[in-house]
């Protein structure tokens, strides 16, 4: 159970769940452990990774968490800040990357995912991001599509120390925040995925 020992903005309620935004530097070791325990349940194939870390390839700037009335973390999203390069004109855009978006199984089907995503996007807009980007498997395209996300059909490139610049596999989705649309052309993430 996580007590109210964390600095957050005012919580948004969804049924008995309080959704709140917390900056990464305000996450205590106790809260980080609770997040990792939840991620292990939601992403069992990545148990070894999430037993050690509560983020994937890029450290979050902030997170949106859902806490039930008993104080347990039941939903999570980590948000990564990145300046990407889009299209032949090399247009720079500041995006918020959605990482490890998940809800515990007992809380799925209640509308919590939709409410959490709306909090994520409102906060991204408030923080001045041009757009949101997420990466997902094919079976999640429809889920995110119902939340207003659009599939991005051009190529997306990542850069890492081992392989240099490479084409990313999987699906990329876009959500306009302070920019009305994504420029046409390929995306260079200017780093690894998140």
PLM segments and residue spans:
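C-terminal "cap" of GNAT-fold acetyltransferases
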Residues: 158-194
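A conserved beta-strand-loop-helix scaffold within acyl/acetyltransferase catalytic domains
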Residues: 22-102
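Conserved catalytic-core motifs of GNAT/GCN5-like acyltransferases
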Residues: 21, 135, 145, 150-173
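Conserved GNAT acetyl-CoA-binding A-motif
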Residues: 122-136
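Conserved N-terminal entry element of GNAT/NAT acetyltransferase domains
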Residues: 1-29, 190-191
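Residue-level recognition of the GNAT/N-acetyltransferase active site
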Residues: 104, 137
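Acidic/histidine-enriched, beta-strand-rich ligand/metal-binding domains
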Residues: 99, 108, 124-127, 142, ...
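Conserved acetyl-CoA pyrophosphate-binding loop and the N-cap/start of the following alpha-helix
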Residues: 106-119
